[in-house]
């Protein structure tokens, strides 16, 4: 555990990096700053065999830092990684993405497309993008910077972009056992879908957060085991890596007010 002060953003990056632990040589994709830093931290610590691109066309042997890098910065290019090779990994199941849905329901289905009736939405967002194919092809984890009942929605998502553990929504030929949702990292806790019948399950509570607060901010029942732990603080080594990867502290803008990671 770290003796240094750490922020909530840093706690979430360290917690998010655990999603890739033990993955081996798969393409790690973090969509958004916190997931990207989490994937980069994993590559530089617990999961050195991960593959990561520069978000353009090259595979890196070391993650690029975020923000301005200076004229003398030289990316650690390893080889070309164009779209054809990206999709070889996607369709072959050799990828693990962490994404940020706008809505998640009790099945683990996710939405980034629209809010309200899709025929007449209250708000139009990105569209389904790559969510349908990703959800049937490889492992996925979720990042939620603001855990509330609007995100963790009662019933089903307004638009199911990413399938989950709902047999009624599975494409022909797919089984629930083939769906692979790993971690759900929020500003309150870490969860997964390892409860009874793939119910969402609490894995750890961030320091100062209670299970009651998590349930209060989730519109469907959360499985709370007897052995829920406190989310581990980032280690000194992890904090050093995070601060090297994000020298301009862009992470502080990703979480509202970015409070201390320990809120006791």
What are these regions (language model features)?
Residues 56-64, 83-87, 129-134, 253-264:
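Short, surface-exposed, charge-dense and proline/glycine-enriched linear segments
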Residues 1-76:
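N-terminal active-site beta-alpha-beta segment that forms phosphate/nucleotide-binding
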Residues 18, 40, 89, 216, ...:
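Charged/polar, solvent-exposed surface patches and flexible loops
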Residues 56-58, 102, 227-228:
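Short, ordered loop/turn segments at secondary-structure junctions
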Residues 217, 226-264:
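A conserved C-terminal secondary-structure "cap"
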Residues 11, 24-28, 223-233:
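Flexible, glycine/charged-enriched surface loops at secondary-structure junctions
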